[in-house]
Amino acid sequence: VPQQNKNITIRLFTDDGTVVPCEEKYTTGMQLQKELDVESDALDDNYTPYQIEFPLDAGCHKKISIVCTIEDAYEKDAFATAATEMARFDALEKKAGYHDELAETLTIAADHFLAYRQSTGLMTVLAGLPWFTDWGRDTMIALTGLTLATGRYQDARDILTTFARYVHHGMVPNMFPDEGTAPLYNTADASMWYFYAVGKYLEYTGTPEDYAFVQETIYPKLKEIIAAYEHGTDFSIYMEEDGLIHAGSGLDQVTWMDVRVGDWVATPRHGKPVEINALWYNALCVTAELAEPVSYTHLTLPTT
């Protein structure tokens, strides 16, 4: 890190022992197995500026607090940080409302995929750090399990709101790249999975406030997506005369089978992919239901 990011300040705290500077601070050319497994850059340098030395007599038990951080706001006591995090986990389990060990374990596991995105000021889903950030398809598929089944309805609203803001040419982003660059839209199914996520959101919540949120924030975007898919948008996505959606052409890979190596398309699926059209049918059903007086007649959504 210090070799590439000279301005980063690394802070190290310990409540015991002696901090001893290392003579050799870098171990270069280390191969990282996880990166190698995902065909990422697998070589890195290990920075070890200090060693912490403390006496430990035979039969002695000790708890040592060590904190290493690059954050501006930090807690020097690792035990206090751990206690705060455990209290947060307890609150998440209580909110989910399960009284089953496996379900509680999954509730906490789901939390690891959710993060606060500074650029939007809202929560988001990270598909797989450090390699993958926000992916539209993955987010919409996982939204039910990560947020709705765990009672995190506000986080679900945040996620739906974020992707609604970035609808472009009637398309939900495929992914938000690192470093804050513009979203990529090369997918036909992320927009369709968005309808599925919206439907599940209302299925789990269903209060007047939630219907009002969908009416004001989400429904206009759903209509925009439907119109774009019907009349045609980017990446050769359009509705044909039989009512089915055509997607993709040339080197474009717009389904989940999106492997491309140079000019070689591993799994070309141009035409009318079956799952895209199943999701298209679902999208039409969700939109039709929202256009009718479902549950709350005073919240009937306009169809024009």
Spans of features found by a protein language model:
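Acidic/polar, glycine-enriched structural segments that form the non-catalytic walls/loops
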Residues: 1-132, 208-212, 223-231, 291
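Active-site-adjacent bridging/hinge elements
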Residues: 31-38, 109-123, 163-173, 250-262
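Active-site-adjacent structural elements in folded domains
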Residues: 49, 122-131, 176-181, 263-274
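Aromatic-rich carbohydrate-recognition surfaces in CAZymes
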Residues: 133, 137-139, 146-249, 253, ...
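Acidic/Ser/Thr-rich, low-complexity mid-to-C-terminal regulatory regions of eukaryotic proteins
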Residues: 254-279, 285
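Active-site neighborhood of glycoside hydrolase catalytic domains
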Residues: 283-294
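Conserved small/polar residues in nucleotide/adenosyl-binding loops
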Residues: 297-303
